[in-house]
Amino acid sequence: MTKKIGIILGSTRQGRISPAIAEWVTAGVAKHPELSAEMLDLGAINLPLFNEPTIPSVAPGVSEAAIAWREKVTSLDAFIILTAEYNAGYPAPLKNALDYLKTEWANRPIFTISYGFSGGASAAHQLSEVLIRIGTVQIEPNIAILIGDKLNANGGIDDPHASLAIHDEELDIALNAIEAWAPTEEPTDV
């Protein structure tokens, strides 16, 4: 049975490089016949700031946005989160997307790819704390992409496959772990 991976683009700003990184990730997933990928671009999904009447650990969100996001997340088996690092943290839209749900994240494998001038280390660390709290299964090793030497004059990545090839083995290890992962009977709330 094919496992469906949601690739979450955590940055929504114009000029972001996550679409180029997602292109490289999608090509890596395509090399694994037991996996398929679906892009979850938070910029396109455009979740409003979390403002549900209750918190997700008490009751599911009731807004159209919350229901659609919950249905999308629960339709997938695993996730790869692409996170930029802004001011030593991960982007607010990513935190917002995580906060909309609680038990839906539990026991789901999540692999993080961070990027920034320091590889996104601070963002990855902060994100890891949240992922632990919501009960995900974190797939290691995370990938930290140093972007300084990969950016063109416009701040983009011209050829993500060539620029990110140094991380191909790490991506393959993570994808193998997702392939091998077996879910528990029922998600647990943490």
Residue positions per predicted region:
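N-terminal beta1-alpha1 ligand-phosphate binding loop
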Residues: T2-P33
